[in-house]
Design a protein with these regions (language model features):
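Short, conserved beta-strand element in jelly-roll/cupin
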Residues: 50-66, 111-115, 166-172, 182-196
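Ligand-binding loop in jelly-roll beta-barrel domains
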Residues: 89-118, 201-202, 211-220
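Short acidic-glycine-tyrosine-enriched beta hairpin
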Residues: 69-87, 179-181, 185-188, 193-220
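A short glycine-rich, His/Asp/Glu-containing loop-to-beta-strand
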Residues: 10-62, 133-176
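Extended, compositionally biased flexible segments
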Residues: 39-102
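A hydrophobic/aromatic-rich effector-binding and dimerization subdomain
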Residues: 107-137
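A short secondary-structure junction signal
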Residues: 120-126, 154-159, 177-182, 198-199
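Generic beta-strand structural signal
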Residues: 76, 82-84, 94, 106-112, ...
Length: 220
């Protein structure tokens, strides 16, 4: 298991912690980038119009609200707990800005590499609200299925060219997660600390690239 510490990035008025980037592509392909952003202010910007091509992005809003505008669907709104999926394919332009909220904003943006055969596919964008996602609540834990299938529950994102499983996991005491053979995976600790397999501490604001096998994760 390999720990990755994030570093400040210039986007989002300097309030971005870049966790995965060029140096981790080989370890977690097709994940290209993971940015964590958080601000209690309401007037921060996330950039002007810019292009994407040959990648997918998934923006997940934990707190606050966001407005996204692109050349595919025009304006899309994302409320707290919702997400935005873009598959740039042959090319698109977009911009994203937080909308006013007394809570500020907190969330993640993840970039994925589209397989070569699909890089010139038709661009696509969609927004998902919190009510579109299903939860698995067991033993005090809460697993929100963002994409893919987990324990028979399927996430709402169904037009991805990649095929990923992403979960938002809140651990009460302990949960067991598994990285399957021939798959790549990582976990990112965005709040609190934990212990994995009773051996290594999981530190907040760090990503951990997983070897294959089962992982017993405890909240400490």
């Amino acid at each position: 298991m390999k720990r990755i510490e994030g570093y400040p990035a210039p986007e989002f008025d300097g309030r971005v912690l870049r966790v995965l980037a060029h140096g981790t592509v080989h370890d977690v392909d097709p994940f290209l980038m993971l940015d964590y952003f958080e601000s209690k202010e309401t007037n921060v910007g996330m950039g002007s119009w810019h292009p994407h091509r040959g990648i997918e992005t998934f923006t997940y809003i934990k707190r606050g609200n966001m407005k996204e505008e692109d050349t595919i669907n025009g304006v899309l709104g994302v409320d707290e707990g919702g997400a935005l999926h873009l598959s740039a394919g042959s090319g698109m332009f977009h911009t994203s800005v937080p909308t006013y909220s007394e809570k500020g904003i907190q969330g993640f943006q993840i970039w994925f590499n589209i397989p070569q055969k699909d890089k010139m596919s038709k661009p696509y964008s969609a927004s998902f609200q919190n009510s579109d996602f299903k939860h698995i609540k067991k033993d005090g834990n809460d697993v929100k299925v963002l994409t893919g299938i987990y324990e028979g529950v399927k996430g709402p994102l169904d037009k991805s060219n990649i095929g990923l499983r992403m979960l938002d996991v809140s651990v009460d005491k302990e949960i067991v997660l598994e990285r399957e053979v021939f798959k790549k995976g990582y976990i990112y600790i965005y709040s609190g600390n934990g212990l994995i397999n009773d051996e290594e501490e999981l530190i907040s604001q760090s990503a951990y690239i997983l070897d294959e096998g089962k992982y017993h994760i405890k909240n400490i």
